[in-house]
Amino acid sequence: MRQGHRMTLSPLRPIPRQLHNAPESAEDFSKRLAELTAALAETAEQYDISAQFPHANFQLLHAHGLLGLTVPTELGGGGADLPRAQQVISAVARGEPSTALILVMQYLQHSRLQENRNWPSHLRVQVAEQAVREGALINALRVEPDLGTPARGGLPGTIARRTAQGWRISGSKIYSTGSHGLTWFAVWARSDDDDPLVGSWLVHKDTPGITIIEDWDHLGMRATSSHEVRFDNVLVPLDHAVSVSPWSAPQSELDGSGLLWMSVLLSSVYDGIAQSARDWLVHWLEQRTPSNLGASLSTLPRFQETVGQIDTLLFANCSLLQSAAHGHTPAQHAGQIKYLVTGNAIRAVELAIEASGNPGLSRSNPLQRHYRNVLCGRVHTPQNDAVLTGVGRAAFAARSKDH
């Protein structure tokens, strides 16, 4: 795999010993996650500046046994359910959200991988066991330069051509979250048949013909390494067409459970950012003592009200996420959860900036970084217009059935 120019960022802290020996109480697990949050926060600013893939963070997560958390226990993983996965994502996001977003993609892939019988069993086992033993990461590469996001419809421009040796894949994927750190690419493509097969082809990172174009220079979530990945006649075995179906008879890739997992975990990243922003503001208000006041800003009703607004927004988020994670929210509301949680998170950080003024936007403080990061919540699928249009359409459809 060829790469463009790449900066180097040395590990900024030692990787601690493995701490995930079972059994572990809920209290001990929560304490361990709090320590993990603090460790990740130590280098969050440096990763924001360098925009490098956070390799040291993933070494740390692997040492804690968290990269295989949603791999089934029979394959050596944690066998985690959605509440457990959400707890981890929230803790990681409070420390370094780019790391959390890449981890979300890992959890989503493995949460449903073993149930996907379209995959050959040996590939399902190989990918899962590598996640547990080696910390190998996987993500789906779907967005393309010409088409954009497949959530809006259309055929991929990436082509898989069947040959005697295997599939030859050519095309480009943009916004490829985790690119430099991934071991496996699940490449959304189509075959060159008259009625093309459309879906995912599994490609190992070391396959010849792969180039990463380092074009990710974003305002927020800078360490996600969401670069363009190009495939030039990349050869994979025939059984690596792991999840494909004819264009004339498409199969949905996500069922209701998958949609809830995606909504809850993705939203938890941005809620975690807002929690960190809230914590910074509270600390700053307690420490800031203007000479003409003779007391900290935290004693003023105006700032108490602002913190109350923020905490109420985050309370709403917690209620929504916990309800969905524990199975109390129907899957049809998955998009609304993402809309509400990310919207509340953005508003919470905006309130923190309004309250802190210039210090909040100073590069010497993390609040401006939290703001840049939290705004990225609006970009993820499903986007706000698609969510609200779908809800409105469903409302009118329900009325037409009643009549």
What are these regions, as identified by a protein language model?
Residues E45-D48, F315-L340, I353-L361:
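C-terminal helix-coil-helix/basic helical segment that borders enzyme active sites and/or dimer interfaces
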Residues H218-L313:
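Glycine-rich beta->alpha junctions and the first turn(s) of the following alpha-helix
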Residues N358-H403:
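Glycine-rich phosphate/cofactor-binding loops in nucleotide/flavin-utilizing enzymes
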Residues M1-R6:
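Short, Lys/Arg-enriched N-terminal segments with co-localized hydrophobic residues
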Residues S172-I212:
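A short core secondary-structure module
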Residues L36, S267, A274-A277, L281, ...:
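Amphipathic alpha-helices that form helix-helix packing interfaces
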Residues H55-A63, L69-S172, T177:
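Glycine-rich flavin
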